[in-house]
Design a protein with these regions (language model features):
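Membrane-interface helix-boundary motifs at transmembrane edges
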Residues: 113-123, 187-199
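Alpha-helical transmembrane segments of multi-pass membrane proteins
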Residues: 57-78
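Hydrophobic cores of alpha-helical transmembrane segments in multi-pass inner/ER membrane proteins
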Residues: 100-111, 173-182, 240-257
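Short aromatic-rich membrane-water interface segments that cap or initiate transmembrane helices
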Residues: 84-99, 154-170, 229-243
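C-terminal transmembrane-bundle signature of multipass membrane proteins
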Residues: 211-221, 225, 237-274
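Alpha-helical transmembrane segments of multi-pass integral membrane proteins
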Residues: 57, 126-133, 192-220
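Membrane-proximal helix-loop-helix units in multi-pass membrane proteins
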Residues: 135-182
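Interfacial helix-loop-helix junctions of multi-pass membrane proteins
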Residues: 142-152, 217-238
Length: 276
């Protein structure tokens, strides 16, 4: 007879609780597979995330421009970051100007894709127009052309504008005339579904020109007659308006690309033609 001390104790397997995360769950699944990963953002959320990010980036650069204007005052202490000229959006090759050019180039590329995929030349026409605006600003074509006109024609000062400013206006007018003809042809040949896109881009580009040309020349005319703070405010208004409408252009083109396809409406049948 075996004594109690010599008996083998039966070992009962111990199952860890599912909350411990070390053993199988009651339904036999792997506990690591029971933890659901967060779902991806739906397409609408992704679009709004990208748009909000771009708008916040615009606001941050405009805020940097505003800080620069205060830090750049003669009696203000120099700021180690924002006193640099690149923060002034009124200067060429500034941070704001570079961001604006990037956005216009992105809009141009997307318009070319729309032209190819939808077989609508009106998108290609708008790509040409926006590219021309970008190249003109990037290579300073209107400034160089204005200087050539001043040298060749001896342009006078008119209505508070310097001869150079008048020459730039003439170059802009010539560019607008040529591009306007191209736009009219593109609009006349545009499919019906692209009509709204045409007028939306026309409005946005018109506002961009209003700030880039109109407010710019107004600044030149009134600056000698207003306090420095008013001149600074006009410069900031021009910079803000240009950047905002460049951003709206790229957002509008992106919306044209992602919107659902509109169903074609069939012509209503005349009651007299209904089969009986």
């Amino acid at each position: 007879m075996s004594t109690p001390s010599s008996r083998k104790t039966a070992i009962t397997p111990v199952h860890n609780s599912p909350r411990d995360g070390a053993g199988p769950t009651d339904d036999g699944g792997d506990p690591q597979q029971q933890v659901r990963e967060p779902e991806a953002l739906d397409p609408t959320q992704q679009v709004w995330m990208a748009r909000t990010t771009l708008l916040i980036l615009n606001l941050l650069l405009l805020l940097g421009n505003l800080i620069h204007l205060f830090a750049d005052e003669p009696h203000e202490p120099s700021h180690p970051i924002f006193s640099r000229p690149a923060w002034n959006g009124d200067y060429d090759e500034s941070h704001i100007e570079i961001l604006g050019h990037v956005q216009l180039v992105a809009a141009t590329i997307m318009l070319l894709f729309l032209w190819i995929t939808r077989h609508a030349a009106v998108y290609g026409v708008w790509a040409l127009v926006i590219l021309a605006i970008t190249v003109d600003d990037l290579l300073q074509i209107h400034e160089r052309g204005g200087a050539v006109l001043v040298s060749a024609l001896g342009l006078p000062a008119v209505a508070g504008l310097w001869p150079q400013d008048l020459g730039e206006l003439l170059v802009w007018a010539a560019m607008a005339f040529v591009l306007g003809i191209v736009l009219v042809i593109g609009h006349l040949r545009a499919p019906r579904y692209a009509g709204g896109d045409f007028w939306l881009l026309a409005g946005l580009v018109a506002f961009l020109a209003m700030f880039g040309v109109g407010v710019d020349q107004l600044h030149v005319i009134v600056e000698p007659h207003v306090p420095p703070l008013a001149g600074t405010a006009l410069a900031l208004l021009e910079t803000s308006g240009e950047l905002v409408f460049m951003t709206l252009i790229v957002l509008a083109v992106h919306q044209m690309a992602i919107r659902p396809k509109m169903p074609l409406r069939s012509a209503p049948r005349h009651p007299g033609n209904l089969s009986r």
